């Protein structure tokens, strides 16, 4: 039975295969016949109407051209709509959102003023500091668009009330200013040495919180709403400040030894985050991010202000790495060096590379690899231990130094002090990936600026730019007034302002300037010739009701009758 059933299956399969073969042959024959009929018909038509063929071709071509034109028009229209949607989402929506927020703040402030005037009572909403409404939406912007042959100049320095207290004894020393201008208020801090600037053992810290208000003649003044004098025995140094909602945060390092001893000693010196909030008592906490005491011999804030970015609190850092640590091994041997257009170095490429590599390891700091970094904390949990240190690659950044972070129109920029062989201000654009709990650096772009050189020493003066190991310079941050050009080759593609010390070897001749990447537009020396000066920081803002731009320059000045160093303010418009 099994054999009979198997034979039947084979026979059925054979019959099925034959049927499929005949169907295929029939289909092929039919297709050939149809093609033949079409070809014969086409020949007959062409032979019978030879005179109309060219007309038919022209008509077809015309219709095809019209079809292509319609398609091109439709495509352009769709592309225009797509671009408009992109522009609305990425540009207009944030602007409108900011305008709505500004309007709400303005209405709240006006409401509070009316209540105080009409009822004679205090307005609880007034507990939160708010700038005068004429300045709202005038902060952290690019105020110009670069145009060839256009120069930026300020007309005059303004007389206005000073908001920074000065030294009160002949040997008092006030140094290291840090200033942060937020959307609702500003924060300021500086260090005070009672026994002169050379005293490393003890110091106090001043912090103030205030708002921008308007004088009767229309110019701004910096009104101090709250201030605090920290005199608790802790020797705070290198404090960076940032304005946060309803308060200020400062990142400081507490020192028990001088700077060179800190880089030599393996005993970790803690960083402290100080909360100065108008609603709550002063709080302090130790910052101890994962691996910090293992990877770093010493780490300090960058002095310049930090920033708020997408609910993250970010401070500049720099310090010395522990030899053979994970970060040290990752960064060792990496280097970055730009070539100066103005101060050309005649060294060979190999000599430049060797000098650049050597520049990261500083003999003065016990041979430590000196690294820049960023402290990142969740603003919503800044009273916890929840912080992390981000390490920028030295493939794209020069040797670690003091610095400042800017958030300008949602772009992060980082100023790095010229502490090594490069004499000019270093400015980088930083891009972050925010997809995880803490961000990761995805891009670092250097902007080559060749104005405002820092004073140096005989090994690395302010008028030379060959890569080599040295330690020198001074903190002189630079403020971009238009979007900095990070493309190569670098051209005159942005405007800047600040103070610099116009001396290649000594901290003398503080000079105010406006400039582009390569040339000054305006320079004005402060005070007498060879005046001693030091750190400087610059912040600009616009009075939106008058469209007038103001820039605040905060600078350390020596040679004072009272105090070794004072902090002096200038306001230009």
UniProtKB/Swiss-Prot annotation:
The reaction(s) this protein catalyses: Hydrolysis of alpha-(2->3)-, alpha-(2->6)-, alpha-(2->8)- glycosidic linkages of terminal sialic acid residues in oligosaccharides, glycoproteins, glycolipids, colominic acid and synthetic substrates
Pfam families per the UniProt record, alphabetical: HN
GO CC aspect terms: host cell plasma membrane; membrane; viral envelope; virion membrane
EC number: 3.2.1.18
InterPro entries, A to Z: Hemagglutn-neuramid (IPR016285), Hemagglutn/HN (IPR000665), Sialidase_sf (IPR036278)
Topology in the lipid bilayer: Single-pass type II membrane protein
Record keywords: Disulfide bond, Glycoprotein, Hemagglutinin, Host cell membrane, Host membrane, Host-virus interaction, Hydrolase, Membrane, Signal-anchor, Transmembrane, Transmembrane helix, Viral attachment to host cell, Viral envelope protein, Virion, Virus entry into host cell
Paired cysteines (S-S): 173-197, 187-248, 239-252, 345-466, 377-387, 460-470, 540-551
Function: Attaches the virus to sialic acid-containing cell receptors and thereby initiating infection. Binding of HN protein to the receptor induces a conformational change that allows the F protein to trigger virion/cell membranes fusion. Neuraminidase activity ensures the efficient spread of the virus by dissociating the mature virions from the neuraminic acid containing glycoproteins.
UniProt note: domains: The C-terminus (head domain) is involved in binding the cellular receptor.
Identification of the protein by name: Hemagglutinin-neuraminidase
Organism of provenance: Human parainfluenza 4a virus (strain Toshiba)
């Amino acid at each position: 039975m099994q054999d009979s059933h198997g034979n039947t299956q084979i026979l059925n399969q054979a019959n099925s295969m034959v049927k499929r073969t005949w169907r295929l042959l029939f289909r092929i024959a039919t297709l050939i016949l149809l093609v033949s009929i079409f070809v014969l018909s086409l020949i007959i038509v062409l032979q019978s109407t030879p005179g109309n063929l060219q007309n038919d071709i022209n008509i077809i071509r015309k219709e095809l051209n019209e079809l292509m034109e319609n398609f091109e028009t439709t495509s352009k229209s769709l592309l225009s709509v797509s671009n408009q949607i992109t522009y609305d989402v990425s540009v207009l929506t944030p602007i409108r959102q900011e305008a709505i927020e500004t309007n709400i703040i303005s209405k709240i402030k006006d409401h509070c003023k009316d209540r105080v005037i009409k009822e004679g009572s205090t307005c609880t909403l007034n507990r939160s500091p708010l700038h005068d409404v004429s300045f709202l939406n005038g902060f952290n912007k690019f105020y110009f668009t670069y145009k060839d042959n256009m120069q930026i100049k300020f007309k005059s320095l303004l007389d206005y009330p000073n908001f920074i207290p000065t030294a009160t004894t002949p040997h008092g020393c006030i140094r290291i200013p840090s200033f942060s201008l937020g959307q609702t208020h500003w924060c300021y801090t500086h260090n005070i040495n009672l026994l002169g600037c050379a005293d490393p053992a003890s110091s106090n810290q001043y912090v103030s919180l205030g708002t921008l208000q308007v004088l009767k003649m229309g110019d701004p003044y910096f009104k101090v709403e709250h201030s605090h004098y920290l005199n608790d025995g802790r020797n705070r140094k290198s404090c960076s400040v940032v304005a946060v909602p309803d308060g200020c945060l400062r990142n400081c390092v507490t020192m028990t030894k001088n700077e060179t001893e800190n880089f030599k000693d393996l005993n970790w010196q803690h960083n402290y985050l100080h909360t100065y909030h108008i609603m709550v008592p002063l709080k302090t906490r130790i910052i101890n991010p994962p691996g910090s005491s293992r990877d770093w011999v010493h780490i300090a804030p960058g002095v310049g202000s930090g920033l708020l970015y997408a609910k993250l609190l970010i401070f500049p850092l720099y310090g010395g790495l522990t030899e053979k640590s994970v970060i040290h091994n990752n960064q060792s041997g990496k280097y970055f060096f730009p070539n100066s257009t103005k101060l050309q170095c005649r060294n060979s490429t190999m000599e430049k590379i060797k000098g650049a590599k050597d520049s990261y390891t500083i003999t003065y700091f016990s041979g430590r690899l000196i690294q820049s970094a960023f402290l990142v904390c969740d603003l919503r949990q800044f009273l916890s231990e929840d912080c992390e240190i981000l390490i920028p690659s030295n493939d794209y950044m020069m040797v670690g130094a003091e610095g400042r972070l800017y958030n300008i129109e949602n772009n992060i920029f980082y100023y790095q002090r010229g502490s090594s062989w490069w004499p000019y201000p270093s400015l980088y654009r930083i891009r972050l990936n925010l997809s995880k709990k803490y961000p990761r650096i995805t891009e670092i772009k250097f902007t080559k600026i060749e104005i405002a050189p820092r004073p140096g020493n005989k090994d690395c003066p302010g008028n030379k730019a060959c890569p080599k190991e040295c330690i020198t310079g001074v903190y002189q941050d630079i403020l971009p007034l238009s979007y900095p050009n990070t493309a190569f080759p670098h051209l005159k593609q942005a405007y800047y302002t600040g103070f610099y010390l116009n001396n290649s070897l000594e901290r003398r001749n503080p000079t105010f300037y406006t400039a582009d990447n390569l040339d000054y537009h305006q320079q004005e020396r402060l005070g007498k010739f060879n005046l001693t000066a030091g750190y400087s920081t610059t912040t600009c803002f616009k009075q939106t009701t008058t469209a007038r731009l103001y820039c605040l320059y905060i600078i350390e000045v020596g040679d004072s009758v009272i105090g070794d160093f004072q902090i002096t303010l200038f306001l230009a418009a």
